[in-house]
Amino acid sequence: MNNKIVKVGNIEVANDKPFTLFGGMNVLESRDMAMRVCEQYVEVTNKLGVPYVFKASFDKANRSSIHSYRGPGMEEGLKIFQELKDTFGVNIITDVHEIYQCKPVAEVVDIIQLPAFLARQTDLVEAMARTGAVINVKKPQFLSPGQMGNIVEKIAECGNENVILCDRGTNFGYDNLVVDMLGFNIMKKVSKGCPVIFDVTHSLQCRDPFGAASGGRRDQVTELARSGMAIGLAGLFLEAHPDPNNAKCDGPSALPLSKLEAFVSQMKAIDDLVKSFEEIDTSN
């Protein structure tokens, strides 16, 4: 199987290339917080020689509660993203939820993300594809890895081949997620070699069946990330926060920002080791 290369700025994202870290925070809480978090990621990834893309949402449109914080909105969020690009020279990924958001967001950021809950919405998929931007498709929690090929085909039919696929866990009964480690290579195959990345922090979500906010298992983020990186992936998708207990969204799953360097160092070591091995074809 040939591995496709998707270019994001000067970064080559591919399953057989050194992994790219797609890291940041869940939602833009403020301009100052975004600057602080991005600066830390840039410092760590530059030190370790890891390709890096900043991630955050300007609007968490799928919060469970009407009272939950959603973010600064598109207009203010794009201003913050532009300042991050100007200050740190980073590439940026963010999600869109509405057709009208696709074009203006793609004019500022480098990757637009199709949210898991919206991945079957054909009109949105087509609007995103027609921007020509790189698209990161989150695998819905309710969809099998093999079904991701249909979403890639929709995007390709619109003339866009710049697709990254991302696993963020699969429903395991009610209010819980599990990661199918066999699914990563299935997604590689059905997409004919698209880069596949792993959203480790969202995969750690678990819920109170009657609560409005997601719980999480950040004490297990390292072991789950190690498992995913051992597959040989194009990238790792990670959320970190300087004070996870007081984060405005998904704090229980977020890596403490103070642990970032140690964490990324381990992921790089695993990635380097796994990709130094000769591939063994066990199909025959």
Curated annotation (Swiss-Prot):
Gene Ontology biological process terms in this record: keto-3-deoxy-D-manno-octulosonic acid biosynthetic process
Gene3D superfamilies: Aldolase class I
Presence of keyword Transferase: yes
MF GO annotations: 3-deoxy-8-phosphooctulonate synthase activity
Highest taxon listed in the record's lineage: Bacteria
SUPFAM superfamilies registered for this protein in UniProt: Aldolase
Keywords attached to this entry: Cytoplasm, Lipopolysaccharide biosynthesis, Transferase
Catalyzed reaction equations: D-arabinose 5-phosphate + phosphoenolpyruvate + H2O = 3-deoxy-alpha-D-manno-2-octulosonate-8-phosphate + phosphate
Biochemical pathway: Carbohydrate biosynthesis; 3-deoxy-D-manno-octulosonate biosynthesis; 3-deoxy-D-manno-octulosonate from D-ribulose 5-phosphate: step 2/3; Bacterial outer membrane biogenesis; lipopolysaccharide biosynthesis
EC numbers on record: 2.5.1.55
PANTHER family for this protein: PHOSPHO-2-DEHYDRO-3-DEOXYHEPTONATE ALDOLASE (PTHR21057)
Family that this chain belongs to: Belongs to the KdsA family.
Name by which UniProt lists this protein: 2-dehydro-3-deoxyphosphooctonate aldolase
Organism: Actinobacillus pleuropneumoniae serotype 7 (strain AP76)
Lineage summary: Bacteria, Pseudomonadati, Pseudomonadota, Gammaproteobacteria, Pasteurellales
Gene transcribed to yield this protein: kdsA
